[in-house]
Design a protein with these regions (language model features):
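Edge beta-strand at a domain terminus
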Residues: 50-57, 75-77, 106, 133, ...
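Predominantly extracellular/secreted and cell-surface proteins with exposed
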Residues: 66-134, 178-270
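Boundary at the C-terminal end of the N-terminal hydrophobic targeting segment
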Residues: 17-22
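C-terminal trimerization/auto-chaperone modules of long, extracellular attachment fibers and adhesins
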Residues: 23-29
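Sec-dependent N-terminal signal peptides
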Residues: 4-14
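Short, small/polar-rich motifs associated with maturation and membrane association
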Residues: 29-31, 40
Length: 280
């Protein structure tokens, strides 16, 4: 009788141990998923995917919406074209503008398709997904999202975003030298704002503001009106944007001691050099 009782106790222990058994799956990202053995009927491994990455490029973004135009959003956005069997997908990834996947058609260097873009809420809320379309070439792709901020267009570009990094408004006091003599150098009364506008990857415009200088020798007060120097191209040898503009027909208003006149830059020495610093 004692042996039978012992066997019953052992059998119950084995059953309890079996019921408590778990299966732990260790994922490649360091996390774990644990299941009770009773929850698993079988484990099947799916066949290897036939997805192939054809192209993957990193480029810069210019984004427009109902609230802003052509705003530069860095140069780390990635576009990847994937072949899945006989179909093609394009994957978009950017830290600010989210992640998108599109079913696309490739035709003689052009790309077009439909899909969606999922964006993380910068305020910490839930992410949102938006229907979107894609079109362009392998170096310039446009993603259109109609229901985001009154209509949002994300332009992805493969190339050097140097001009867009340089674009912006720069504030400081300016100096003028009268007659080419260093002793007759004067600063503006207040800080002024110079504006650099990107035309394309390697060309900028420079908007020079109205500037006021007081008590110039033999001239009195001087006010120079605003003007724009256009199409200043990147010069690799100078490591700067350079343009001689004496023959561009640029005019400006100038008031000297209360007398206003209209003038044109015609001197062959008229030259502008815009040299970006390390961060653009």
């Amino acid at each position: 009788m004692k042996k039978i009782f012992t066997l019953i106790i052992l059998a119950m222990a084995v059953v309890t141990a079996a019921q408590a058994q778990t299966i732990t799956i260790n994922k490649t990202d360091g996390t774990k998923v644990t299941y009770d053995a009773s929850e698993v009927s079988s484990i099947d491994f799916a066949p290897k995917s036939d997805t192939t990455t054809i192209h993957s490029f990193t480029g810069y973004l210019l984004v427009s919406s109902a609230y802003f135009q052509n705003m530069y959003y860095g140069d780390a956005a990635q576009m990847s074209v994937l072949a899945v069997g006989d179909k093609y997908l394009c994957r978009f990834d950017d830290a600010t503008w989210g992640h998108g996947l599109f079913n696309i058609t490739l035709d003689k260097g052009t790309i077009s398709g439909t899909g969606s873009v999922t964006m993380v809420n910068p305020q910490g809320g839930a992410s949102t997904t938006h229907d979107a379309t894609m079109s362009g070439t392998m170096t310039h792709i446009t993603i259109s999202i109609p229901d985001l901020m009154g209509g949002t267009t994300i332009n992805w570009n493969y190339g050097d975003p140097r001009a867009y990094k340089t674009a912006g408004t720069y504030s400081a006091k300016d100096n003028i030298v009268v007659g080419g003599v260093a002793d007759y150098s004067y600063s503006t009364n207040d800080s002024v704002d110079y504006t650099v506008v990107a035309v394309n990857d390697s060309t900028i415009n420079l908007v020079v503001p109205e500037e006021s200088f007081d008590n110039l020798a033999m001239m009195g007060n001087l006010v120079m009106g605003t003007y724009t120097i256009s199409n200043i191209a990147w010069d690799a040898a100078e490591n700067a944007y350079v343009r001689s503009y004496g023959s561009d027909g640029i005019t400006f208003d100038c008031t000297i001691a209360g007398k206003k006149g209209h003038y044109e830059f015609t001197n062959s020495d008229c030259k502008v050099v815009v040299r970006p610093n390390a961060d653009g």
